[in-house]
């Protein structure tokens, strides 16, 4: 079978999942004919993606979330205003996606949570079946438990998730643990897609804390904590592309440009891991048996962190309070069930992708009403 990938380019999670799925498909005799990746002025495609993906990569301009002026949590108002101005550009991108779907000769389109893919299918109804993959589709599962959060923000998150999957035959929801499928919402629950490099690493406990932050503004938190605890080695990765590959602050604090090989190597040998609660790196740390401090940067990561904590991954904080992480690490016990769950990903995924999806109904726009109509009591209660 021939597959076309369309990938949200924000962060490293969806990019890593695309690399992993391409490896699985190629290993089993299938072909990825092309990879379309969303781009924006505030994000750069990491070098590890171009080095590891085999199919031709093409870019298109896509919506993205802007951080607050302090470059920490995502600012919803700034993001909405910015993306409204860019609407004409996004319309061009939708037309481009439609053209690439038609020209690719693909048997399936795999959508890694890219909004414009859903809008393309809503507006043009391409004949090639679309299958959506991402942990975010678990937010639409009838049994998913949300953290206590602003009801409007949660409704918007679910609305956005539905928009990404308009016209999809199936939603494949990556999960920290086994859950029953939700056929009513076209949701199949599957294990996380971890790269084989993660499974090949032999973890050990070093003397340093490893970390990753999507928004570089969190580096101030890390440096503040470091000044108070200079004896504890810290090695953090960030997306601050204007900096040198390794910014060595002193003998015990360094910031690294995102490099997947080095990132995983350092994770395998760390004492503990601190992150802005992106799904992919939390899964990698869980697989390697590392205690985790999760510092969510937006509502999606609030949900990730809450769900990961339920699975025994670690603790949640509003900032990089690494002392909390060190205390938690003393009594931490890895979740071995997670490792067994992850090892079933390839078999489960191939079964689903190779099956005939013609019996599934497309997810239409009126599905949005199922997820984004909070009651007046919910809205008033969120203030």
Predicted regions and their residues:
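C-terminal amphipathic helix plus adjacent low-complexity
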Residues: 329-373
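Conserved nucleotide-sugar donor-binding subdomain of glycosyltransferases
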Residues: 72-108, 115-116
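A short, glycine/small-residue-rich beta-strand->loop->alpha-helix junction that serves as a flexible
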Residues: 7-19
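A donor-sugar binding/catalytic signature common to diverse glycosyltransferases
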Residues: 109-112, 265-304
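Single conserved hydrophobic/aromatic residue that forms the stacking wall/gate
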Residues: 371-383
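Conserved nucleotide-sugar phosphate-binding/catalytic loop shared by glycosyltransferases and other
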Residues: 9, 28, 33-85
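Donor-nucleotide binding loops and adjacent catalytic segments primarily
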Residues: 193-269
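Active-site-proximal region of nucleotide-activated glycan assembly enzymes
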Residues: 128-189
């Amino acid at each position: 079978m021939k597959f076309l990938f369309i990938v949200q380019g924000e962060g490293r999670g969806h990019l890593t999942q695309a690399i992993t799925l391409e490896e699985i498909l190629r290993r089993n005799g299938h072909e990825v004919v092309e990879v379309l990746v969303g781009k924006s002025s505030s994000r750069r495609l990491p070098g590890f993606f171009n080095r590891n993906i085999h199919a031709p990569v093409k870019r298109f301009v896509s919506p993205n979330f802007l951080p607050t002026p302090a470059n920490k949590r995502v600012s919803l108002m700034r993001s909405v205003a910015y993306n409204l101005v860019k609407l004409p550009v996004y319309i061009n991108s939708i037309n481009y996606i439609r053209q690439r779907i038609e020209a690719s000769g693909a048997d399936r389109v795999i959508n890694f949570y890219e909004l414009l893919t859903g809008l393309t299918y809503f507006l043009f109804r391409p004949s090639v079946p679309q299958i959506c993959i991402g942990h975010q589709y678990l937010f639409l599962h009838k049994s998913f438990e949300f953290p206590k959060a602003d009801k409007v923000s949660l409704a918007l998150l679910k609305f956005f998730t539905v928009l990404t999957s308009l016209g999809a035959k199936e939603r494949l929801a990556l999960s920290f643990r086994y859950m029953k499928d939700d056929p009513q919402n076209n949701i199949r629950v599957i294990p996380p897609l971890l790269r084989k490099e993660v499974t090949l690493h032999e973890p050990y406990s070093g003397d340093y804390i490893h970390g990753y932050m999507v928004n570089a503004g969190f580096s101030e938190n890390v440096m503040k904590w470091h000044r108070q605890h200079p004896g504890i080695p810290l090695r953090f990765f960030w997306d601050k592309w204007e900096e040198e590959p390794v910014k060595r602050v002193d003998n015990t604090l360094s910031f690294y440009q995102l490099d997947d090989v080095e990132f995983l190597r350092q994770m395998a040998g760390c004492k503990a891991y601190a992150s802005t609660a992106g799904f992919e790196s939390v899964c990698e740390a869980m697989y390697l048996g590392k205690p985790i401090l999760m510092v969510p940067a937006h509502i999606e990561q609030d949900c990730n962190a809450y769900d990961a904590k339920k699975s025994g991954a670690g603790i949640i904080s509003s900032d990089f309070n690494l002392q909390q992480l060190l205390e938690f690490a003393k009594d931490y016990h890895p979740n071995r069930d997670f490792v067994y769950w992850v090892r079933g990903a390839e078999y489960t995924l191939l079964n689903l992708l190779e099956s005939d999806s013609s019996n599934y109904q497309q997810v239409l726009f009126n599905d949005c009403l199922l997820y984004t109509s909070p009651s007046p009591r919910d809205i008033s209660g969120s203030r």
